[in-house]
């Protein structure tokens, strides 16, 4: 069983559809799981905002999948953050990490500059494990490096589904994550241009997502705000949580995959090793007896 948090109690996602079937939308609050991830990774404020936006986007995209399917997002730019990697599944489990947790560029007004942290030049790669022989992979250039717009651009350009995404993370001066969440809206055939125009007007006029979340807006509240005047039905409410699938057994398999010669060299030169999971920062220590046991297992194959 991987590492997880009690954010399952407070973090959740709601999925709705317009009554005429032309628009689907999801909204979520992720304050607990984002706070836990940032604490584990020791992220500075701008890195926290970037990681929080990305894992929230991952949770929203994971909710579009079927049971057993997974999605991975990789943002890679030329900024000091280096990269963000997020994995999410259809059951509400999400995890993520950043290349440089201490990246902390600020704008001239003192606000967190996520785009500068990621860098203006780079790629967003989306990999979906749909249970087929090969995973589906799509790649687009970063659009604004603000994450929400990049995901909307990917969905619209690569998957050919007109989409709007809003993401927000509010980080307190002391580095604590006070609010995190977002929404994803997609236009479906038969497209209702009037309803889409109304939604885009609402999105254009709405305050920042972080402001609405700090006012106490729930996922239901975000959707009510966006869908004003558009009848819709709620399809699902699901819990979201930070869950890491790492385990000592998995790390053992990684060490075994090094092969007999490399594992023997590790045993002879160091006598022990420690492996840290990049997603949850859990440490796994393997002493001499552990390495000898793994080496004996390889020899017996």
UniProtKB/Swiss-Prot annotation:
It comes from the Bacteria. Keywords: Chaperone, Cytoplasm, Disulfide bond, Redox-active center, Zinc. InterPro entries: Heat_shock_Hsp33, Heat_shock_Hsp33_C, Heat_shock_Hsp33_N. GO terms for molecular function: protein folding chaperone; unfolded protein binding. Its main location: cytoplasm. Disulfide bonds join 244-246, 277-280. It is found in: Cytoplasm. This is 33 kDa chaperonin. It comes from Geobacter metallireducens (strain ATCC 53774 / DSM 7210 / GS-15).
């Amino acid at each position: 069983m991987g590492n997880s948090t009690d954010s399952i109690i407070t973090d959740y996602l709601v999925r709705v559809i317009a009554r005429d079937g032309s628009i689907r939308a999801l909204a979520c609050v992720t304050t607990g799981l984002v706070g836990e991830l940032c604490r584990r990774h020791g992220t500075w404020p701008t890195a926290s905002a970037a990681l929080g936006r990305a894992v929230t986007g991952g949770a929203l995209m994971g909710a579009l999948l079927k049971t057993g399917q997974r999605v991975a997002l990789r943002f890679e730019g030329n900024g000091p953050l280096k990269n963000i990697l997020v994995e999410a599944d259809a059951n509400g489990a999400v995890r993520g990490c950043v290349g440089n947790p201490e990246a902390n560029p600020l704008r001239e007004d003192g606000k967190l500059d996520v785009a500068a942290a990621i860098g203006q030049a780079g790629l967003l790669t989306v990999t979906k494990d749909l249970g087929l022989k090969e995973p589906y992979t799509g790649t687009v250039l970063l659009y604004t490096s603000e994450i929400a717009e990049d995901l909307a651009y990917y969905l619209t350009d690569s998957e050919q589904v007109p989409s709007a995404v809003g993401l927000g993370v509010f980080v307190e001066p002391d580095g604590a994550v006070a609010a995190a969440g977002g929404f994803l809206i997609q236009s479906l055939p038969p497209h209702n241009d009037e309803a889409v125009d109304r939604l885009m007007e609402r999105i254009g006029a709405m305050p920042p997502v972080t402001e609405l979340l700090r006012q106490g807006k729930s996922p239901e509240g975000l959707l009510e705000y966006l869908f004003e005047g558009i009848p819709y039905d709620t399809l699902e409410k699901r819990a979201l949580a930070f869950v890491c699938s790492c385990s000592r057994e998995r790390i053992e398999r990684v060490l075994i995959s090094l092969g007999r010669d490399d594992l023997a060299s590790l045993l002879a030169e160091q006598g022990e090793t420690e492996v840290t999971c990049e997603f949850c920062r859990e440490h796994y220590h393997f002493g001499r007896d552990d390495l000898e046991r793994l080496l004996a297992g390889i020899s017996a194959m």
